């Protein structure tokens, strides 16, 4: 699991994002893919100790294709410059919250939550936050959680959404357009021989947030 080698390959791919270069380095990419799946296998095994719902997940099913869909994009680069894996008990296409690891030179992260929820599901999660605000705050305002995830949601409304009390005392928690969290890590993170332990610590905190949101999300799936 030589993560610096994976990052080095991705850096060179971003500088030579052509089919010709990729074909010339296809064997190297296959080694990168194998190494990344080995990393995921290790993480899955460790997460399963506190979240047995992911114990059946296979590394191959967590990974995303490196090929970009360029049909509707002005950027015709054929390959992504990152590699990612989403450890999700219900599959990587589910709205169910899981554990995401993203490797990209200069933009690595550990993340999770639910992106692009249908509007009725998003409304239900917001309502759950309102109805259980003290429980939600006990999770997201816990220093152990905020150490990794100081912000809830990637994008936010400017005002409280329609149908919710305008005087709600914690508006930032229901203005979220998504319920996701992310911990950005430097490339040097992986130089630490104990980086797996740190990843597990991050995801252990993430589980608390995931459990709260999944309680509502799973009613829709």
Question: PLM features: residue spans?
Answer:
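Extended cationic-aromatic binding surfaces that line active-site or macromolecule-binding grooves
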Residues: 35-91
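Contiguous, amphipathic alpha-helical segments that mediate oligomerization or scaffolding
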Residues: 5, 15-50, 201-220
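Short His/Asp/Glu-rich catalytic/ion-coordination signatures at enzyme active sites or charged loops
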Residues: 2-31, 181-195
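Well-ordered alpha/beta subsegment
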Residues: 3, 138-142, 218-219
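Aromatic- and glycine-enriched beta-alpha-beta binding-site module
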Residues: 71-130
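Compact, glycine/acidic-enriched structural inserts
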Residues: 105-164
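Charge-rich, low-complexity terminal tails
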Residues: 168-221
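Sequence-level motif detector for i,i+2 pairs with an aromatic at +2
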Residues: 61, 80, 107, 176-178
């Amino acid at each position: 699991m030589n993560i610096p080698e994976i990052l080095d390959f991705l850096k060179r791919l971003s500088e030579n994002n052509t089919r010709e270069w990729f074909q010339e380095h296809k064997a190297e990419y296959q080694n990168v893919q194998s190494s990344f799946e080995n990393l995921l296998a290790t993480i899955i095994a460790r997460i399963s100790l506190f979240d047995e719902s992911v114990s059946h997940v296979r590394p191959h099913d967590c990974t995303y294709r490196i090929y970009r869909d360029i049909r509707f994009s002005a950027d015709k680069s054929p390959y992504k410059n990152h590699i990612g894996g989403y450890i999700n008990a219900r599959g990587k296409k589910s709205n169910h919250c899981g554990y995401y690891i993203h490797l990209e030179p200069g933009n690595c992260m550990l993340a999770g939550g639910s992106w692009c929820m249908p509007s009725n599901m998003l409304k239900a999660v917001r309502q759950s936050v309102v109805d259980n605000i003290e429980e939600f705050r006990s999770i997201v305002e816990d220093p152990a959680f905020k150490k990794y995830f100081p912000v809830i949601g990637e994008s936010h409304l400017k005002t409280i959404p329609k149908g919710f009390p305008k005087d709600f005392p914690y508006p930032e928690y229901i203005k979220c357009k998504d319920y996701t969290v992310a911990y950005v890590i430097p490339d040097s993170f992986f130089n630490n021989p104990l980086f797996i332990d740190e990843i597990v610590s991050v995801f252990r905190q993430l589980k608390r947030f995931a459990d709260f949101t999944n309680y509502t999300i799973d009613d829709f799936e």
